Every structure is written in C-alpha cells, then in structure tokens.
Amino acid sequence: MEYLQKYIRQNIKIFACNSDKTPATPKGFYNASVDQEIVEKQFHDPEKMLIGMPTGNGNNIVVIDIDVGKPMENDHGEKILDSSGNEIIDPRTVNEILDELKELGPIPNTCQVETPSGGRHLYFKVPFTKINSGRRYFDKTLPIDIRANGGYVIVPDGKSDYIVYDD
C-alpha cells in the first residue's frame, strides 16, 4: 500500500491491474482515481495486483515505451521471419534503440524506468496532448510505442524488478 499512497500524494491517478497487466476494474483506466478510499477498494489483494497509470490527459503524462527482445517487424508492422518461418527476435539493446531514437531529434532529460522485461519507459509531463497511444509516430521497425490518450502503463510498485533512473 506504500506505493499506492506515493502516487495518491503526487496526485497521480492509478487503478488496479491483474498480474497479466490487464485492468482489474470494470472500466479499466477510466476507473483510475486519486481518492484513497476508491483506490484501496480496487486493490483488494495488493500483493497480487499491479498498479496501472493512465497516460495522456488522464495524468498529463506521455510515455515512450521501448521494448527489447521482441519479434522484429517491417515498416508495415508485419513480423519478419527467417527462412524457416520463425520470427526473428530484435537483438538491439535499450541503449541502441535510444541512440536510433535520438537520430530523430534530441530527447529531453526525463524520468526513465527500466521495466522487469528489460525495456524502458520514458515519462514526459505535458500540459495537454492530442497524442493518442500507438506506434505510428516512429519508424515501425523501432520497437517503440507511445502511451498517451487511450493508454496506460504499469508503474513501479515496490514488488516487481523496476529500476528508476531520475535525471
């Protein structure tokens, strides 16, 4: 419950998610709240639940989500297969992907969180955004998603293996 309180104190809306990262609330991220009573009811089994945070205008936060070790895709979003028909796993590290992203323009210093799968979330505070969640903002060969309006991310909860880099 300590991490729940941390987000509530920072006025960050949160909601309960199941261990498979799916929402544990009837309306998903639309049930996110900073009301302690509402949040505590959602987290009826906090040891088994993850903390979801709406992105976009719900919290005025946009997240760049970098995945590693995923199947590679071409610029049409189709998985790339080897000669045997098996998916080719992207060998790039987070830092290599960040370097490719920087070629598109500078990345401001921001809070970064290494996810349990080895990926990275880059958090950006925004006053208002018209950006929607999706992949269409980047070269589709980069394993990067934007989490904004219509999306959410799982945030550090003190139980999972997250590493926070706060520049």
Residue spans for each PLM region:
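DNA replication initiation modules
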Residues: 56-78, 83-85, 91, 98, ...
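Histidine-centered active-site/metal-ligand motif
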Residues: 121
